[in-house]
Amino acid sequence: MSRIGNKVITLPAGVEVTNKDNVVTVKGPKGELTREFPKVIEIKIEGTEVTLHRPNDSKEMKTIHGTARANLNNMVIGVSEGFKKELEMRGVGYRAQLQGKKLVLSVGKSHPDEVEAPEGITFEVPTATAIVVNGINKEVVGQTAAYIRGLRVPEPYKGKGIRYAGEYVRRKEGKTGK
């Protein structure tokens, strides 16, 4: 079993962590994130190091411990560096463009799809067929990218659709005639 929960989280310069009744606030150069952690996990902040402790070694406690540590580490990385998810579009006439904070996608439907940026999320469109989702909250960045991908999932015959950058789409052969 992984022992990720026992690892110490080292805070980069400019990142400040406060804990009040297991509601942890992480402030950094890119913004501020707040999250409530389970009451069974004890969070200790000592200078530039944060450690999490569990009350016992039951399987349930180990899973909660590792998840809480990973969530807190993602908050620290988010406010210091941020997260980004890149998507690419394949298909004839598939294109993306920004209208203010709104992302407008033409993906072979009779109407364009419009995606509003959730709070703390920004979109970039470096080329007409590339989309970059940026933000400080890893979960929201991933959910937003997954929603955009879900608007036109890559199909296995021609590979048309929206995919993550570097994603491998398994291809199938079409029907063969008689």
UniProtKB/Swiss-Prot annotation:
Function per UniProt: This protein binds to the 23S rRNA, and is important in its secondary structure. It is located near the subunit interface in the base of the L7/L12 stalk, and near the tRNA binding site of the peptidyltransferase center.
Complex and partners: Part of the 50S ribosomal subunit.
Entry's family note: Belongs to the universal ribosomal protein uL6 family.
GO cellular component, one term: cytosolic large ribosomal subunit
InterPro entries with a match to the protein in the record: Ribosomal_uL6-like, Ribosomal_uL6-like_a/b-dom_sf, Ribosomal_uL6_a/b-dom, Ribosomal_uL6_bac-type, Ribosomal_uL6_CS
Organism, scientific name: Streptococcus mutans serotype c (strain ATCC 700610 / UA159)
Entry-linked PROSITE patterns: RIBOSOMAL_L6_1
Protein name: Large ribosomal subunit protein uL6
Alphabetic keyword roster: Ribonucleoprotein, Ribosomal protein, RNA-binding, rRNA-binding
Gene Ontology BP annotations: cytoplasmic translation
Pfam family, one: Ribosomal_L6
Gene3D superfamilies, alphabetized: Ribosomal protein L6, alpha-beta domain
